[in-house]
């Protein structure tokens, strides 16, 4: 990190294409990465990586066979609406999720919303990090930018 102007922490992909259904970036795991990073990297160089996507798993999950579909945050909400699914919020992971049935198959979806991103913004402030960076930034998620504008001075 001495040679870097800034470091980007990849704090996501806990829930991933070939893994079991879970939050993409559960807050306790994100915090543990930041806890370690600040012991090795000056905080003014650290950008917290934030996912701008989610995954849709078909259940039951079978390791080595199952493959989740990568979806955008807006797409996740659209799927929930289309199937009348209730979006729940995991208080530990600080992440939204829901299940739905399509063609007789149960699906489980985990994604990011303003509540989960707000929790990650809290870590940026708490640790005094330089800022944040996004994976899959080109996926439209206007609510993120509105939240960001309300919480940070953007340059």
Indicate where each model-derived feature is located.
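Short, small-residue-biased leader/transition segments that mark boundaries at the very start
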Residues: 2-5
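Active-site-proximal beta-strand/loop segments in catalytic clefts of secreted hydrolases
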Residues: 9-14, 49-55, 111-114, 135-138
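Short acidic/polar active-site loop segments enriched in Thr and Asp
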Residues: 44, 130
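Generic structural signal for well-ordered alpha-helices
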Residues: 30-38, 121, 146-151
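Extracytoplasmic/secreted cell-surface and envelope-processing proteins
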Residues: 16-21, 56-61, 141-146
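Second-shell loop/turn segments in exported
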Residues: 18-24, 106-110
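Conserved, mostly hydrophobic/aromatic
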Residues: 7, 48, 124, 132
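Glycan-binding loop/region signatures in secreted carbohydrate-active enzymes
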Residues: 50-123, 149-155
